[in-house]
Amino acid sequence: MAALGGDGLRLLSVSRPERQPESAALSSPGPGLCCWVSVFSCFSLACSYVGSLYVWKSELPRDHPAVIKRRFTSVLVVSSLSPLCVLLWRELTGIQPGTSLLTLMGFRLEGIFPAALLPLLLTMILFLGPLMQLCMDCPCDLTDGLKVVLAPRSWARRLTDMRWLRNQVIAPLTEELVFRACMLPMLAPCTGLGPAVFTCPLFFGVAHFHHIIEQLRFRQSSVGSIFLSAGHLIGPVLCHSFCNYMGFPAVCAALEHPQKWPLLAGYALGVGLFLLLLQPLTDPKLYGSLPLCMLLERTGASETLLCS
């Protein structure tokens, strides 16, 4: 060894691999295990949400006020406990988001006004054709219609309507909280932000499969799910509520409408404007810093266009 000299000793010291501390190697699970934990957590949330709807056994139809009230109770309990699942996921994976869990889930004030208005405006543009059809078929003019919509008595009547509360308030709020705000942060470090946005509807479909059992009819999913990537929950909730109110576009009825050509032009114009305005109205610069991007940076996930 002495014959090697200083240069030889340095060469041996460089070529010898350094042992990693066992504590560092065991501090967090590998990426494969993290993905399994994320998928299992999301699947558990979806099953819990659906299971809460069937806790109350009843022969009454799902639109009966008594059934709706019971389901309100169960889904509100599950939704209020769902952030605990994200907290448990963080502890199991060792991932540190770099921000509070509430901020990560879209509960923040920065950029809240554009996050509430711009996604809803974009969704209304997409529904330009159905909105035109609704106005054409309305027996009253626009002024009288606005008076009816804004009247306090009309709102008081809605707030006592269980089906309206379910479709416009409880379902959008609880579903977006569970299937967007809680699931996206858990899936994003595993799949990346873009694939995570398109993976969430798979779990969302689990929650809506029970409608096929109860009633064979199509129910649209929320158009506003992608806007959670703006870092706010309020946008997806409002868009979800609006889509529930509008329902699926009645294209067949538009084809048989007396004014079908203006209506079809409205449908085409709405889709065209939606595609044209989608990128500028969902620019992350409008909504402030994105907590999900901070999460991806801390986990070393590949960058997405939203975070660049």
Curated annotation (Swiss-Prot):
It is found in: Endoplasmic reticulum membrane. The chain crosses the membrane at residues 25-45, 75-95, 112-132, 186-206, 233-253, 262-282. GO terms for biological process: CAAX-box protein maturation; CAAX-box protein processing. It is a multi-pass membrane protein. The record marks 240, 244 as: Transition state stabilizer. Its main location: endoplasmic reticulum. GO terms for molecular function: endopeptidase activity; exopeptidase activity; metalloendopeptidase activity. Its EC number is 3.4.26.1. Belongs to the peptidase U48 family. PANTHER family: CAAX PRENYL PROTEASE 2, PROTEASE U48 CAAX PRENYL PROTEASE RCE1. Protease involved in the processing of a variety of prenylated proteins containing the C-terminal CAAX motif, where C is a cysteine modified with an isoprenoid lipid, A is an aliphatic amino acid and X is any C-terminal amino acid. Proteolytically removes the C-terminal three residues of farnesylated and geranylated proteins, leaving the prenylated cysteine as the new C-terminus. Is able to process K-Ras, N-Ras, H-Ras, RAP1B and G-gamma-1. This is CAAX prenyl protease 2.
